[in-house]
From Swiss-Prot:
Gene: hisI
Residues holding Mg(2+): D92, D94, D96
Protein name in the entry: Phosphoribosyl-AMP cyclohydrolase
Enzyme class: hydrolase
EC number assigned by the record: 3.5.4.19
Sequence positions that bind Zn(2+): C93, C111, C118
Source lineage: Bacteria, Pseudomonadati, Pseudomonadota, Alphaproteobacteria, Hyphomicrobiales
Entry GO CC: cytoplasm
Keywords per UniProt: Amino-acid biosynthesis, Cytoplasm, Histidine biosynthesis, Hydrolase, Magnesium, Metal-binding, Zinc
Entry keyword Metal-binding: yes
One example GO MF annotation: zinc ion binding
Length: 149
């Protein structure tokens, strides 16, 4: 069974209030996905999905994304073992963003750097210049061991 999404309505109230899921992909065929931990709500990552990735995620309850840099479908955690099991999928009011609540397997790390979250740095102002400060330097795994080329 292939999952096909209907074209979104041009009627704003239908997008906001109707029961049909009609995701609004951008001009590149992508939709933004925000990913949080299902247990503690921590923001883990932001990625993009094409229609195939979104359909696979809905059908399998395992997170799939579209890699813009590699130009292909990507099953999160396939290499590292940190698969994301989806417990809930939400969309925003105009259906142009997806929110996945996930449980991360393996090392409980989402970032390819080995950290739990891709959001491990704060942006701060020092001497009038924006700088990055690491707030989570704990590595759950060694990326050089997992992602050998």
């Amino acid at each position: 069974m292939n999952l096909v999404f209907n074209a979104p309505s041009t009627d704003k109230s239908e997008l906001e209030d109707a029961g049909d899921f009609t995701p609004r992909f951008d001009d590149r065929g992508l939709i933004t996905a925000i990913v949080t931990d299902a247990h503690d709500g921590e923001l883990l990552m932001v990625a993009h999905m094409n229609a195939e990735a979104l359909a696979l995620t809905i059908k399998t309850k395992t997170a799939h994304y579209y890699s813009r840099s590699r130009g292909k479908l990507w099953k999160k955690g396939e290499t590292s073992g940190n698969l994301q099991t989806v417990t809930e999928i939400r969309t925003d009011c105009d259906q142009d963003a997806i929110w996945l609540k996930v449980v991360v397997a393996g090392h409980d790390a989402t970032c390819h750097t080995g950290r739990r979250s891709c959001f491990y740095r704060t942006v701060e102002l020092e001497d009038g210049k924006p700088v990055l400060n690491v707030v989570d330097d704990h590595l759950h795994f060694d990326p050089s061991e997992i992602y050998r080329k």
